[in-house]
Amino acid sequence: MEFKHISVLLNECLDALDIKDNGIYVDCTLGGAGHSSHILERLSNEGLLIGIDQDRDALKAAKERLKRFENVKYVHSNFYDIDNILQNLDIPKVDGILMDLGVSSYQLDEGARGFSYMKDAPLDMRMNRDNDFSAYEIVNEYSEDELYKIIRNYGEERFAKRISNCIVNRRSDKPIETTMELVDIIKAAIPAKARREGPHPAKRTFQAIRIEVNSELKILNQTIEDGVNRLKPGGRMAIITFHSLEDRIVKLKFRELNDPCTCPREFPMCICGKKPSVRLISRKGIEPTKEEVEENPRSRSAKLRIIEKL
């Protein structure tokens, strides 16, 4: 199957990175190389792109798409390891870092990966298939309380209690092995009126399990800090999020880096000594245009936030 992924907020990202032709840029989520191909077109031979992805299929597709470019380094890893990756490449500082936190169209559409609640597949959801831990372990081995907490916290699902209870009851008969088995359980747990009126009933639960499988939110705060430490003064970091949990983490971390002062508000001046390390380029998240959403409905929930290293 062709690795296809329509780049979201493409022009906005390119503008955000303020690309220098001899700069060093890191695409932390290389995917199908949509953003990266355009970054490379703006680089001279003196510039460099470092593409990171934990999905070997994505790296293979990216290498094929970018084969005409020689100034690319490919890294099979999770972007949370950005500090070690740059250290191993002997690159102390970079000019820009891009993170696109969305699941690719390929991962959603490729049945065998188990990301989609629209296609039957084994319960998997691993971004990095070298890892042993998958959705199967979560669904079949987590306690009811553990399931409830991740579905509520990571999926913001109001019927988390009912869903977790139904999962535990059903798996007592036999293991839950496929996405469609899980979808049927979720549908049975959600009241008919809510199923009719809201988004797909399995959407939030699948999001929650995917986040847990890949530790997506746990690594984000530290990754932002490590990335900012690797930026040159004037270097930019641009992050695209696709749901409110991710966006909240990015927004709060950016604000903290922009205003780290911990002094009580009533103090007339700062005495804690903490100085800003970045400035906010976008106070609010940049959203796709109406035209982009019409062309690519999956971009609807995207938000882009940008900071610049001081």
Curated annotation (Swiss-Prot):
One of its GO terms (cellular component) is cytoplasm. Disulfide bonds: none annotated. The keyword Cell cycle does not apply. Its main location: cytoplasm. GO terms for biological process: rRNA base methylation. It is an enzyme of class 2 (transferase). It comes from the Bacteria. Specifically methylates the N4 position of cytidine in position 1402 (C1402) of 16S rRNA. HAMAP family: 16SrRNA_methyltr_H (MF_01007). This is Ribosomal RNA small subunit methyltransferase H. It comes from Clostridium botulinum (strain Eklund 17B / Type B). The gene is rsmH.
